[in-house]
Structures are given as structure tokens and as C-alpha cells.
Amino acid sequence: MEDSAELQRFYEQGYSLPGPEAERFSRWRSLGAIGKAEHVIELCRRARIEPSSTLDVGCGDGALLSELARRGFGGRLVGLEITDAAVAIARQRKGIDAVERYDGQSVPAPDASYELGVLSHVLEHVPDPPQLLEEVARACQAVVIEVPLEANLSARRHTKREHAAEVGHLHSLDRADARSIVREAGLTVRAELADPLPREVQLFFAQGARARIKANARWATRATLHGMLPDLARRLFTVHYAALCTPSPSE
């Protein structure tokens, strides 16, 4: 996927699934949005930022914005999305002030017009992550990014690589890669965190008692290891990395 038109066609299919399948993935995205919203709020707390306006770039069906609205966080909530189908869904959600379609490259807003920007699980999907992050940072005074750290032993398995390709991941990142993207965009990390998938997300696709027991054990093992030895955990399995970034000081 080399351009925004190709990206748009790819993701349009993901938001145009038949009824039962669409409902299932809608629940999946809403479940994932809980942890993502917690990350945004916690990073803003650490950086002492209380945004009165928030722009979610690549907002999908608006699940994250909806969760922020439910928690009363972020002030005026606006989303930008590349697909018509997702925009239509997001506009139906309560608490979101506006959702617009954009070209995947240029943010249609003046400089520093939003106090907070969000790129949650977006940068791994685009051809030039630093370029998009720099553009979002132009329009937003601070930006929260979140990416999966997939440069690990588990993600090297053939089935994992196939899944990453199926969902449109163009980059397999580690923490150093993510921080490098931030630097290339002219930004500095002010606060960061990482954690494995939440228990509820691990259990979502587990069918049957045995599968749920196995998924629960996997979650417990990973959460414990990440809590004790986070560097080792990141080398073994995927964790989600989030950082709040602001423009680097001029020299």
C-alpha cells in the first residue's frame, strides 16, 4: 500500500462487513478503546495536560473518541478518518462533536488549533510514519501516539506475520523504532508507558472453556512478566507502547 487511495480502499472493506461480523468487530474495537482511552488520560495526567480540544487522526469508527466522551475527557472531540464507511459509523456515536473524512496525509486544520492530537494504532499502518506524525503535531500542541511493539520473538511466527499483514501493518516496531519516529518528526517524548493486551481483549476471541482458560493463563503470565521484567517481555511478545510528545525545543 503505497498511497492514501490504496489505504482507503483497503480499510473501506474492513468497515463494510456483513451484519453479524460487523457487530462482532465493533464490540472488539469498543473493548480495545477502553485501554487506549486509559493510556491517553494517564499520559496527559503525567504531562499535566488537560485538553479542551482533542483531534483523533485515523479515528476509525470513533470507538476511542466515544470512550473519552464517556469519561468526560478531552473537551471538544473531533475525528479524522480515511474511509467513508467508518466516518458514517463514527458520526452516529454520542459525545463526538465532529468526524470528517481526510486524505490520510494532510490535517485540515490551522497550526496548533487543537490542544491534543491522538494517533492510536495508526502509525504502523502508514507508509511514512514520521511525516504523518509531524503533520498532526503541526495542528496539535501535543500528540499521543500508540503502537504495537511487534519486533519480538512471538510476532516472528508465520501465523503472526500473516495476521499483521492482513490487518495492514506496514511496519514491525520496537520501542527504539517508535522513539525514532518521534525524533524524526521533530518531537520529544514527555511521558510514556507500555503494557500487554488487557485480559478482556485476550479473552475476546477465545471460543469455549478450554480456550478461555488458555487465554487467561497467557494473559496472567505475560502481565506478570511485563511487570517484573519489562525489557525481556518486549523481546518475547507484543506489548502496546504509548507516548505523549511535544515539539522539541529549538536550539
Which role does the model predict for each range below?
Residues 7-31, 93, 127-248:
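S-adenosyl-L-methionine-dependent methyltransferase catalytic module, highlighting the catalytic core
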Residues 119-122:
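A short beta-strand submotif of the Rossmann-like class I SAM-dependent methyltransferase core
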Residues 1-110, 116, 133, 193-194, ...:
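Conserved N-terminal segment of class I S-adenosyl-L-methionine
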